[in-house]
């Protein structure tokens, strides 16, 4: 017998302690601290060491048992047959070796038939039916003894309280998985967050926490569901002789079984099924972490038997982990095309979801604070399919004493403009909309759009080319373009280039309302832009207005007033506006309506325009109404003064008639405005 190195003994002892700790958190507290992949890695390391040094194997090793002892808060429920876990396969070679072990043990020359199904990420339970009636529901617990959760199980509508059909045994144990599907999980978390309550990290935690509530009324409010995956103890009757046929029978008796189940032949069939489900994994309505292969014929299962903690006739083939632990090195802030700031975690590179991840989104500062993410933390990173990797949770037990809080910058990391965050909003934004390089593409596209400066021929793709070629940095750069520069772009001939230069020249003569809208100020749509233009009469007066003055404008509240004032306070934005004026952009200014707003004839009235007018556009009609002190709304309500209906008026007219709101014809509208 070879001497066992002391460091091996210490490592084995350390692994057992760590696995026992995580067993307790996972099986007993239902509050796992590390992802399944990290636990699996620890277990495999211990298995490998015990295989190499069998003298170190002890009866209490985590490799020799299923889990930990159940909590005492529920009554104990002893299983009539042990509920064992499954061994795992991570690579194709593991599946081939699994099949070879089976064939060697059975002495089979022909290929083995396997029942295959997705491995749901939920909570395993046992349902006991006596004379067709549900009499007990129990968690797996340590495999021999679980917890009696009958009252909670009865609240899950996917679980029948009475079996259907006929032919079921007098005593039948159904085994399956309680889980929360993705839609239910997301809806539950949204509602919990809106109430300021705790949200769950993932559907598995949500299912486990919900099923183990001491008050079944709480469980009843949670969107739990169930899939049966097999039968356990049976008395007073017989079941079919294959696993697949048993699932079919359970379905006939009213149990919910997974529609993705199948029967395949040999390891090749198993691997093809693994690939097929893997391709559809992200589109399934529930989370899975692998697929399960079971020898289909029970007679062969009985011949194969069990090892200490798992059956020889089944294995779980895991997909690349969608969650992993790693170190959060730093947090940086990215500026999106609309100016939104997103905190991004810079990570110690980790392999997760099939790729190496070194960056992950933290979404916004509300999420950072809710999860209490700090620089230096060990975090759980999640990546599913093509979804951007995210920091799902913090492993608080591994937080170092020098972990640093994440601090939101006060100025844009791209352009230096002030960062603003409106009350009640999760997202902070850069206020340098016209100047910020991160926002330039969207700013130029909006500026050129039909309802803004209406630059004919300047579409989104051409804007992309102009920015990529370095010809335009900010919107004022559009008016410095030459036909020669434009002709050199892809799909831009000499004629098209001259046409665009002419369109740019034509757009210089505009309306103040259009120009204000073209600036892309947050929350300022066409109607608000018109209201601002009418109220102040000129751009200089608008730029000089403080928030209090802005709130005197019809339909402008504190949020919009703050956005407008902040926009014009930024030196970079003012520089771009000055450059546009120097380039020749101009409009006709008027006397500010603010001087006599309360005395205007339509002050206090609200109108809605619908259909096509013959005498003017709806936009022009709205300007006339606002010039007379009225508000123009896009929707009809009981507070609407009247609806002005042109030709082909639509649903707004119908709603006005339903609410009893007066309807004016075009002739009545012209009379109203004095024309």
From Swiss-Prot:
Q: Does the record's keyword annotation contain Metal-binding?
A: yes
Q: Which cofactor does it need?
A: Mg(2+); Mn(2+)
Query: Which EC class heads this enzyme's classification?
Result: ligase
Chain sites annotated for binding Zn(2+): 412, 415, 430, 436
Q: Where does NAD(+) bind?
A: 36-40, 85-86, 117, 140, 177, 294, 318
Task: State the UniProt keywords alphabetically.
Answer: DNA damage, DNA repair, DNA replication, Ligase, Magnesium, Manganese, Metal-binding, NAD, Zinc
* Protein name (Swiss-Prot/TrEMBL): DNA ligase
**Which gene is this protein's source?**
ligA
């Amino acid at each position: 017998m070879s001497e066992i190195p002391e460091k091996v003994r210490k490592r084995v002892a350390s692994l057992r302690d760590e696995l026992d700790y995580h067993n307790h958190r996972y099986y007993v507290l239902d509050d796992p601290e590390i992802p399944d992949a990290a636990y699996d890695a620890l277990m495999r390391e211990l298995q490998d060491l015990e295989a190499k040094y069998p003298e170190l194997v002890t009866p209490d090793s985590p490799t020799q048992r299923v889990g930990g002892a159940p909590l005492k808060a529920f009554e104990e429920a002893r299983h009539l047959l042990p509920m064992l876990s499954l061994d795992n396969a991570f690579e194709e070679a593991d599946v081939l070796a699994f099949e070879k072990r089976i064939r060697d043990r059975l002495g089979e020359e022909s290929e083995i038939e396997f029942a295959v199904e997705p491995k749901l990420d939920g909570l395993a339970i046992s349902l006991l039916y006596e004379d067709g009636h549900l009499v007990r529901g129990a968690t797996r617990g340590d495999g021999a003894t679980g917890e009696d959760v009958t009252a909670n199980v009865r609240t899950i509508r996917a679980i029948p309280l009475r079996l259907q059909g006929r032919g079921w045994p007098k005593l039948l144990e159904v085994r399956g998985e309680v889980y929360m599907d993705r839609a239910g999980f997301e809806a539950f978390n949204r509602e919990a967050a809106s109430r300021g309550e705790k949200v769950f990290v993932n559907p598995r935690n949500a299912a486990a926490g919900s099923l183990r509530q001491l008050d079944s009324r709480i469980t009843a409010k949670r969107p739990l569901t169930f899939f049966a995956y097999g039968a356990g103890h049976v008395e007073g009757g017989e079941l079919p002789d294959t696993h697949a046929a048993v699932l079919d029978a359970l379905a006939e008796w009213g149990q919910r079984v997974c529609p993705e189940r199948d029967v395949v032949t040999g390891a090749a069939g198993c691997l093809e099924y693994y690939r097929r489900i893997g391709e559809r994994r992200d589109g399934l309505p529930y989370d899975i972490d692998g697929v399960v292969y079971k020898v289909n014929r029970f007679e062969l299962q009985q011949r194969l038997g069990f090892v200490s903690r798992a059956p020889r006739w089944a294995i779980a083939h895991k997909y690349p982990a969608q969650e992993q632990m790693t170190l959060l090195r730093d947090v940086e802030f990215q500026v999106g095309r609309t100016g939104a700031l997103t905190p991004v975690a810079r990570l110690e590179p980790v392999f997760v979801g099939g790729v190496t991840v070194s960056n992950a989104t933290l979404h916004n500062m509300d999420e950072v604070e809710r999860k209490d993410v700090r620089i230096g933390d060990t975090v759980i990173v999640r990546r599913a399919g093509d979804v951007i990797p995210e920091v799902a949770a913090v492993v608080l037990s591994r937080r170092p004493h020098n972990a640093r809080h994440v601090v939101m910058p006060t100025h844009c990391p791209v352009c230096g403009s002030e960062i603003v965050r409106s009350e009640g909003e999760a997202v902070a934004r850069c206020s340098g909309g016209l100047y910020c390089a991160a926002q330039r593409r969207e700013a130029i596209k909006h500026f050129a759009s039909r309802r803004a400066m209406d630059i004919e021929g300047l579409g989104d793709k051409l804007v992309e080319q102009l920015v990529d070629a370095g010809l335009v940095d900010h919107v004022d750069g559009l008016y410095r373009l030459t036909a020669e520069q434009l002709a050199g772009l892809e799909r831009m001939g000499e004629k098209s280039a001259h046409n665009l230069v002419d369109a740019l020249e034509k757009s210089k003569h505009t309306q103040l309302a259009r120009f204000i809208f073209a600036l892309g100020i947050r929350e300022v749509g066409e109607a608000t832009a018109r209201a601002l233009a009418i109220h102040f009469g000129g751009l200089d007066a608008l730029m000089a207005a403080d928030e209090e003055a802005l709130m005197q404008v019809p339909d402008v509240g504190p949020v919009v007033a703050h956005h407008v004032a902040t926009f014009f306070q930024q030196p970079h934005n003012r520089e771009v506006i000055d450059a546009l004026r120097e380039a020749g952009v101009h409009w006709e200014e008027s006397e500010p309506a603010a001087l006599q707003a309360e005395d205007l004839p339509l002050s206090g009235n609200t109108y809605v325009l619908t259909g096509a007018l013959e005498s003017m556009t709806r936009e022009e009609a709205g300007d006339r109404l606002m010039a007379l002190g009225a508000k123009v709304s896009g929707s009809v309500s009981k507070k609407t003064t009247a609806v002005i209906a042109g030709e082909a008026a639509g649903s707004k007219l119908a709603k006005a008639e339903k609410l009893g709101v007066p309807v004016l014809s075009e002739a009545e509208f012209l009379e109203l405005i004095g024309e």
